[in-house]
Amino acid sequence: MEADLVVGAVLVPGAKAPKLVTNALVAKMKPGSVLVDVAIDQGGCFEDSHATTHADPTFKVHESLFYCVANMPGAVPATSTYALANATIGYALAIANKGWEKAIGEDPSLGYGLNVHDGQIRYAAVAKAHNL
């Protein structure tokens, strides 16, 4: 395997990430390869992944280095908060100004963010992930 860097960024909304890189594949990688599992908050997409911290971010598997820090944006909290606020402020204002029902009626994409309503889980993938 010739990769110096492998970034796993798999997202299945509401579900655990599938394991796409096996231990056997990592064993074939060249020494010093780095694997970054961005999907670690959803369980990780590398077979050997386990959540690490900003204080102790890496571990070795065979001769490769894994970086599996949960909540990676936490390394740059001011920047990540600014980015998240900019990405979500329009939705928040629509809900605040119109109420959630009218806001969803006018912008159906907001409905994809409705996970729980009236005591029921409304998002099938979340219910399935939690066996509910």
Where are these regions (language model features)?
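Rossmann-like adenosine-cofactor binding region
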Residues: 1-63
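Adenosine-phosphate binding glycine-rich loop
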Residues: 40, 45-132
